[in-house]
Swiss-Prot record:
Family: Belongs to the universal ribosomal protein uS2 family.
SUPFAM superfamilies named in the record: Ribosomal protein S2
Main location class: plastid
Gene3D superfamilies per record: Glucose-6-phosphate isomerase like protein, domain 1, Helix hairpin bin
Coiled coil: none
Single GO BP term: translation
A single Gene Ontology CC term: chloroplast
Signal peptide boundaries: none
Name of the gene this protein is made from: rps2
Name this polypeptide is given: Small ribosomal subunit protein uS2c
Domain of life: Eukaryota
Amino acid sequence: MARRYWDINLEEMMGAGVHFGHGTRKWNPRMAPYISGKRKGIHITNLTRTARPLSEACDLVFDAASRGKHFLIVGTKDKAADSVASAAIRARCHYVNKKWLGGMSTNWSTTETRLHKFRDLRAEQKMGRFKRLPKRDAAMLKRQLSHLQTYLGGIKYMTGLPDIVIIVDHQEEYTAIRECLTLGIPTICLIDTNCDPDLADIPIPANDDAIASIQLILNKLVLAIREGHYSYLGSH
């Protein structure tokens, strides 16, 4: 896999607060190699140890996208949800930004059934069939559709398991990570100083609580995915 230049700038990362970790009492000793020191009771991430895996991750997703592979971006906490949806839409990826439903990937047949139901309800609503139903029945179907939109809206076009999963805050998304490990799906994870880097295929040490930090990391990955997509389209 060829290395490319992704304009990963240490000053830019510092400006976004990528280097700020958690309080020194809330840390995972396995993160020690990525920590450069302490400041006012919090750990500081060594940004050179962030730049390297971020560049590696960009190379990986570019290469995968250039071969037509599919991505899923996961980040369900409030500070990440909007950034995850925005990044996924720009990169034409699938996303989960509300709640990871247990078994979403390991019990794919059930998820697929829910997606078929979701698509059918959307089609019925667009064709105006809800309006021809009794009010009680129409209200029940609208509630079902709203529920499915909330939890499956970001994966409504998925037809199979993703090739790579990008995860924001792997403490929050532990269930998703365990499912990826079970299925052997490669993961790229933002890992803060309280995380276990060994659970990710490519751990990117970064502040996973600051919106600016999350957006910076996702923006780099999105750029690489988009360039990979263009390369794929240009060769087909």
